């Protein structure tokens, strides 16, 4: 599969498939495709449907199989960016819930519960996120623009809650309160901030 991401405000990812290749997408994500694409709708079982209910994704997903070489395009549902993520076993990624757009067939998504309850209650990203695993390329949609940082082991970054789009599964998210009453009530910022850090090797 080869792809190109086009457009600025409402981007589209155009995937060029060889015969027999398959793409998976959320319902309603497909924008246009060649007639050689065969569509099938599947929920993936009761467990996966319930998981998608928690993570804010559509309950059913569509698969598109190329009966011949052809293209299929998936469009973002809001202004922002489409980001391509390559995942492999041991290289999983945590993304915003409902950020999944489309992927190759060997990519899997599952509900990811933040282990620290306080991070879910006070963090802008919520208690429930989405974990992307498997093997292949996944496309996610993010509202607004993105800035990427590569943290080293032990390095930390404080982020205004709600601005975290995705992180490697090796990262951990904790929540810290803004110190000082004056800062809390007069600072004009949120009361809680996300602290992202890399886990130390075990």
PLM features per residue range, with description:
Residues 194-202:
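Residue-level detector of conserved catalytic or cofactor/ligand-binding positions
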Residues 1-135, 142-147, 151-156, 160-174, ...:
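N-terminal, charged/glycine-rich beta-strand/loop interface patches
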